[in-house]
């Protein structure tokens, strides 16, 4: 789970 997941959410 990368930081990108935060943006996706």
Swiss-Prot record:
Main location group: secreted
Gene Ontology, cellular component aspect: extracellular region
Location of the Barwin domain: 1-9
Swiss-Prot/TrEMBL GO biological process terms: defense response
Keyword Secreted: yes
Top-level division of the source organism's lineage: Eukaryota
Protein name: Pathogenesis-related protein
Species assigned in the record: Ephedra distachya (Joint-fir)
